[in-house]
Amino acid sequence: MTSDAELIKILSDASSGLLYQTELDYPFEVLILENTDKTAINKENILKLLKGLPVDYIEDYDFDFLFSTPTLEQYWHSENDKKRVVRYRNLVSLIKKNLKDIKVFRKGKIYIDVYITGRAPSGNIAVVSTKQMQT
C-alpha cells in the first residue's frame, strides 16, 4: 500500500513545474487531509476541511473536462508544448491510478480554487489543488 507521504511525493513530482493555464497560470499543490478516513468527500466537508466559509460558492466539476485541454495535443504545438501534454497525461493517469472516488470542486466565481479530491490508499482524503481565473 502506498503511504500518504509516498503519495504526496508521487503526485508532487508529477505536477512539479506544471502550471494550470487559464487567464492566469497557477502551480499545483498536493496535500493529505489527516484523520479523514471516515469523512465523506462532498462539497460541504471539503469546504470545512479547507477552511472555507459556509457562504463561499462551491460547485462540483468534471475531472476529465478539467484536464481536456491540457491533455490534448494540437498540430501547432511546439516540442515543449508536446512534452507538457505528456506530463499532464501522466499526472491524470497517476491521479486515477492512486485515488478512488475522485471528485473535483471549484470554489469561487472569478478567482477559483480548484480541489481535485479522492480517497488515498490510507483512506484519508488527498487533494491536488490549483487555481483558475475566469472573467
Regions found by a protein language model. Name each.
Residues L94-T135:
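Amphipathic alpha-helical binding modules
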Residues M1-R84, R89-V92:
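N-terminal "domain-start" segment
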